Amino acid sequence: MDTLLLLKAAIMGVVEGLTEFLPISSTGHLILAGSLLGFDDAKAKVFDIAIQTGAIFAVILVYWQRIRATLVALPTERQARRFALNVLIGFLPAVLLGLLLGKAIKAHLFTPVVVASTFILGGFVILWAERRQQAAVRIHAVDDMTPLDALKVGLVQCLAMVPGTSRSGATIIGGMLLGLSRKAATDYSFFLAIPTLIGAGVYSLYKERALLSAADIPLFAVGLVFSFISAWLCVRWLLRYISLHSFVPFAWYRIAFGLVVLATAWSGLVTWAE
């Protein structure tokens, strides 16, 4: 396989790994990177599933101790069952809304103006959330969440169906606005990412199954590995970062990137369509 193509796959994997779990929208960055690299044909949809799988493996590895402990304790411990139930409750709204409105959203909302607007608006929402964070915290750990808290965050996660919103951004900032601490909101966002991304990946793989080819396995493998490594490093870094810092820098980054979306679309440099 062409070495240049494998290099592009590695770059796309790194972009996915670095942006999937930060509140900055991986989709917007993948479209921009794919367009600039010429890595945006029909098979790119299947490739996106591969690199997203690498990111999922990374967050599972980071939280493996907690995941394993929960699975082992499910038959005997009420807290483990409550935690698993909260993840399930948070996951379901996105499933239902995705099945009902997914096609319509992709058909009508994937435009430069929408993507840029959600990037910029999301930046200002982060700034607002951080301003009220200290006074609003009532939940300091994921284990303190109620099923109603989980449902509310799950409903907020549905906003991520709008291009440019960011799934992690919606759940983390939404959680903070609902009273979760920065750490609790981030942890729950990552736990919620596991079933959400797996479900989305399986559904997308089924839809795009006609594009699968054994010849593309090396390409997908490179993307998956680089996505896994970069996502693992990114998640571990973010968990350390939020113990000392706020999400304000990500807010300004989103606002700037939204302007980049508009500039690249108006110049014709990037085609902002899925």
UniProtKB/Swiss-Prot annotation:
According to the record, the segments passing through the membrane are 44-64, 85-105, 109-129, 185-205, 215-235, 250-270
Entry annotated with the keyword Chloroplast: no
Name of the protein described by the UniProt record: Undecaprenyl-diphosphatase
HAMAP family, per the entry: Undec_diphosphatase
Q: Where in the cell is it found?
A: Cell inner membrane
Q: What else is known?
A: Bacitracin is thought to be involved in the inhibition of peptidoglycan synthesis by sequestering undecaprenyl diphosphate, thereby reducing the pool of lipid carrier available.
Query: Which UniProt keyword terms apply here?
Result: Antibiotic resistance, Cell inner membrane, Cell membrane, Cell shape, Cell wall biogenesis/degradation, Hydrolase, Membrane, Peptidoglycan synthesis, Transmembrane, Transmembrane helix
EC number from the UniProt entry: 3.6.1.27
Which Gene Ontology BP annotations are present? Answer: cell wall organization; peptidoglycan biosynthetic process; regulation of cell shape; response to antibiotic
Q: What's the stated role of this polypeptide?
A: Catalyzes the dephosphorylation of undecaprenyl diphosphate (UPP). Confers resistance to bacitracin.
The Swiss-Prot or TrEMBL record annotates one GO molecular function as: undecaprenyl-diphosphatase activity
Which family is this sequence assigned to? Belongs to the UppP family.
InterPro entries xref list: UppP
Q: Which organism is it from?
A: Acidovorax sp. (strain JS42)
The signal peptide stretch is none
Q: How does it sit in the membrane?
A: Multi-pass membrane protein
User: What reaction gets catalysed by this protein?
Assistant: di-trans,octa-cis-undecaprenyl diphosphate + H2O = di-trans,octa-cis-undecaprenyl phosphate + phosphate + H(+)
